């Protein structure tokens, strides 16, 4: 999504999002350039529109959403000046149903040489738990020089140099 830049339009944008969310059943995710921040930590200077921040924060609270963590950087937009303003305008928020189905949802930042925004990739942070099983691939036997030892390392008889 792309949020408007003008304050009057931002108020209408948030109301439109409320209306859309009200129609949603099941898991959903809002992602894109909101052109809004809800906390001072999302900007690298103190030039803040606190009234608009409050409106966005109330919208997020009322919508009962969770913000997806951003990996790789803190800010997603720069005005690209010598002393840049940096802001996290690009974000993703999910409902609780989404979080139940995709509990490891994340945003990964990517490099961009084309835009003043960095691209974000939606992904899952997967945890591998437990002991991993050995999996034999039958094509290995066709690889020249392949030798399979079914037992443990102690049964190989020899050193690592052999």
What does each model-identified segment do?
Residues 1-162:
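A shared catalytic/ligand-binding motif for oxyanion handling
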């Amino acid at each position: 999504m792309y949020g408007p830049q003008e304050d009057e339009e931002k108020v209408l944008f948030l109301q439109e999002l409320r209306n859309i969310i009200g129609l949603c059943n099941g898991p959903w995710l809002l992602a894109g350039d909101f052109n809004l921040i809800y906390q001072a930590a999302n900007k690298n200077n103190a030039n803040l529109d606190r009234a608009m921040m409050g409106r966005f924060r109330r919208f997020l609270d009322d919508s009962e959403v969770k913000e997806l963590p951003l990996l790789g950087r803190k800010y997603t937009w720069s005005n690209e000046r010598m002393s840049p303003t940096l802001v996290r305008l690009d974000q993703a928020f999910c409902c609780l149903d989404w979080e139940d189905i995709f509990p490891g949802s994340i945003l990964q930042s990517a490099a961009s040489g084309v835009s003043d925004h960095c691209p974000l990739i939606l992904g899952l942070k997967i945890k591998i738990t437990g002991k991993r099983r050995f999996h034999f691939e039958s094509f290995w036997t066709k690889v020249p020089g392949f030798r399979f030892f079914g037992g443990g390392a102690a049964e190989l008889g020899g050193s690592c140099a052999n």
